[in-house]
Structures are given as C-alpha cells and as structure tokens.
Amino acid sequence: MLRKVGDLTRVPPTGHPPCTLQPGARLNRMSQKVAVLGTGKIGEALLSGMIRAGWAPADLLVTARRPERADELRSRYGVTPVTNPEAAKTADTLILTVKPQDMGTLLDELAPHVPADRLVISGAAGIPTSFFEERLATGTPVVRVMTNTPALVDEAMSVISAGTHATADHLAHTEEIFGAVGKTLRVPESQQDACTALSGSGPAYFFYLVEAMTDAGILLGLPRDKAHDLIVQSAIGAATMLRDSGEHPVKLRENVTSPAGTTINAIRELENHGVRAALIAALEAARDRSRALASGKKD
C-alpha cells in the first residue's frame, strides 16, 4: 500500500530531553529530535522536505564532514550542525544517509553513544538491518529505507522495511519522515534488493531513455531543445496517465497503437532489438549488485 503523508502543523517543543521509547509506545513527532547524518543530495532533500512538512528547524540536527558545509546548512535551513557522537546522544531518531562503503566507519563512531531506545533509519543501498543490529546496542530498532533522487522534487518512492526490533510505530514514524518527500511503501526486507533495482535505480533508466530518444530526435532533424521538450512532456503525460487512470500499461499502449501505424512500427523495432529482454536483464543485474553490496563486495 502506497502512503503519501500530507503537510502537518507542528508546534516546536522547548528543551526536551531525548525520549525513552518503551516497546509498543507511540512515537510522537512533536517530542522528537531528528538527526540527518550524511547531508549529500538525498540527505539535504530529506531535510528540506521535513521543514516544508512542518518540522521545526530547531529540532533537526545535521552532521557534515566539512565545516563550510555545516555552516551552509545552518544558514539555509536554520538547523543545528553537530558531531556524529553528539547526534547519537541527543537525537531521538538517527537517519543515516552516507554511502554504503562509509557506513561501517560511521557505525564504529556512533555505536558507543547510541542508546538502545534510539530509532536508527538507514538509507544505504544493499546493507541489511542485521548489519546495524550487530554493531549497535542489543534491542536497537532499525528501519531500512531505499529512496530515490526524485526526493529532490518531493516525488520520491521510498521503500521501507523493519528490522528485528522495529515496531509498527517505528515504521509509521519513518513513513511520516519520508512521506515529506514523496510516497512510501512497506515491504519485507527480503524484497529490498528487487525494489532497489526497480525504484532506487529506476530514475536513471528513464533519464537514459530520454537521452536516447533526444538523440533520435536530433537524427530526425529536430533541434535538441525541441526534442527534449517533446520527450519530457510526453513522459510526464504518460506517467500521469499510468498513475491516475488505473489502466494496465498494455491497455494504454494499445490505445495509441493503430493498425499499420507509426507506433506499431516503432514497437516492432524495439522488440526486434530485444529492448524488453535488455530491461529485464538490467534490473536483474541491479538486483544482483545490491545483493553483492550486502555481502561486502566492492567490485
């Protein structure tokens, strides 16, 4: 089931201590401090989306490797830069958005400072919740999230899975956070690698197709800017029809495929060149790479 969390009004708390969440207790956003550790493009998109959705900047903590980056985030959003250990000690929820290859080092730094009642949310591709549970205090709730770059425009698809100690309320809290930048979907963790292949990497496939179709437009005699505009608007329209009509994509394709027409001739060439099989193979390769990341392989 897809979930889109709407804007909510938030009254900022004043000087609360970190909350202690008992098993089954209800998470309350109005008594939460959230820290984003790793403020690259996705981390910053999540930060800005949360503020637009009603989180008070005073309750948002950030970490950054470079002091100038920390100052930039403070100036732009009014958030509080802290060190990684300070974030672990102060925040109720830790969102880890560093690269997968950097996660082990980050956890080594955090582990001595993370109490077992902190919610830890990982946004790293391919790393299972067990990786965190083995390195953090026993009983620490961990939620795994795979989001994608459309978070930059509040159109992300974020796939959420619970670790061993994460409750329904932890999942709901995670959905509220990532719902600020798009839609969320709960899946068993065993499906995360497949979801990474489809939606985590998915935007890149569409960009690749737009690039190829733009080149085709140039070959057919169109200026690059006009070819680009034609393709992008067609993509937006097609995606909107898929989302809003409820029709199967085959039906929508058939509606524009006239007998002996231009579309069926184009589809024939796509089939002759194995485009469908290539897409399936590409997604299998992405799935396999996600699995390899989980096993610690770098190449």
Short names for language-model regions:
Residues 46-47, 67-68, 76-77, 81-160, ...:
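Rossmann-like NAD(P)(H) cofactor-binding subdomain of soluble oxidoreductases
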